[in-house]
Amino acid sequence: MEGGGGGGSLPPFLSKTYEMVDDPSTDAVVGWTPAGTSFVVANQPEFCRDLLPKYFKHNNFSSFVRQLNTYGFRKVDPEQWEFANEDFIKGQRHRLKNIHRRKPIFSHSSHSQGAGPLTDNERKDYEEEIERLKSDNAALSSELQNNTLKKLNMEKRMQALEEKLFVVEDQQRSLISYVREIVKAPGFLSSFVQQQDHHRKKRRLPIPISFHEDANTQENQIMPCDLTNSPAQTFYRESFDKMESSLNSLENFLREASEEFGNDISYDDGVPGPSSTVVLTELHSPGESDPRVSSPPTRMRTSSAGAGDSHSSRDVAESTSCAESPPIPQMHSRVDTRAKVSEIDVNSEPAVTETGPSRDQPAEEPPAVTPGANDGFWQQFLTEQPGSSDAHQEAQSERRDGGNKVDEMKSGDRQHLWWGKRNVEQITEKLGLLTSTEKT
């Protein structure tokens, strides 16, 4: 390494280093400082490539630095490779003989020969340090292994995410192409608008038309439907008004007929007149009384052979004196009528055939009538039950047709009006038959 040649007393490394630094042709790579007390390696790569192989048969800059340290050279500037020695000065080659090679403080031979065995404390310290280094090494190894596993898992997740991303991109492309084809199809826009209009419409359930709807029916409806201005509502309202006017006309007719029958008709035979009043009392319910006409309850007395004009006049006076009495309910009126009709003996011959004078006709003696001429008529009329089967069937059919649309009060009033109409027709027919019989 140090090479041969040069002065016999000088080490070859020192002589070759001095020649290399003192050569002016190598000042660009290595040379003296301006003071001449040190040298600087300016270009380390070229120094290793060109000068070290030429002078020292190697190109290792570290080995060159170690040799300098062996001969007592030191580094002057930490920013650059500048070395100095007290006897290595420019122009003073003769001072190189004062530079000697330093011997190492600890050599393998001297350590093996002169060093004694380690003490227990030193051995213990070394062992503890070794164990600490082993534990640190194990911790670092486990951490490295965990980091390696995490890295592998992260790589797998990244790969899965990339695959999902590719799938989503493919689906998006297919969806866009499909939508583009649908939009390009003819008639798509019109059908789409029709579907939107169809979905905007609200479904309404048909509501049965009823004049009297209770609260439960309105609450159970799913969809409200306003029929205030509909043609069906107008039609049913007109029909209802017509029917109501017809019923009012019929009611007025019945009241007028009751007035005529109660005031103008007198009977020549012994059958008492208030029997017609009994029928008319049943025709008028307590809630339908007219303020113009009062239908007082008639007190019927049993005709006997000893009854005379005093009985008839007394009955008329009692019937007129009861004008302020309250009306009898429908059910009680029917029961009382049947009870009182059963007490009348239609086949009995009255002792006195004269009746009290009416308000419109003067009092005169009626012609004698053969007893029993109208007994069959009056027996059939008086024994007939007010709620006949025909009237009852008609009322039931009327209620079935109405269903739940009309409440119980309206159904009862309608049944009462139909029953009254039928009885008035029967009264009219039988009065006509009576008139023809009397004429004959």
From Swiss-Prot:
Residues 295-305, 380-390 have a biased composition (Polar residues). A motif (AHA) lies at residues 375-384. A motif (Nuclear export signal) lies at residues 158-163. SUPFAM superfamilies: Winged helix' DNA-binding domain (SSF46785). GO terms for molecular function: DNA-binding transcription factor activity; sequence-specific DNA binding. Exhibits temperature-dependent phosphorylation. InterPro entries: HSF_DNA-bd, WH-like_DNA-bd_sf, WH_DNA-bd_sf. GO terms for biological process: cellular response to heat; regulation of transcription by RNA polymerase II. Keywords: Coiled coil, Cytoplasm, DNA-binding, Nucleus, Phosphoprotein, Stress response, Transcription, Transcription regulation. Residues 121-181 form a coiled coil. It is found in: Cytoplasm; Nucleus. The keyword DNA-binding applies. Residues 333-343, 391-417 have a biased composition (Basic and acidic residues). Gene3D superfamilies: Winged helix-like DNA-binding domain superfamily/Winged helix DNA-binding domain. It holds the Pfam family HSF_DNA-bind. One of its GO terms (cellular component) is cytoplasm. A motif (Nuclear localization signal) lies at residues 200-204. The hydrophobic-rich region (HR-A/B) corresponds to the oligomerization domain. AHA motifs are transcriptional activator elements. Transcriptional regulator that specifically binds DNA of heat shock promoter elements (HSE). Homotrimer. This is Heat stress transcription factor A-4b. The lineage of its organism: Eukaryota, Viridiplantae, Streptophyta, Embryophyta, Tracheophyta.
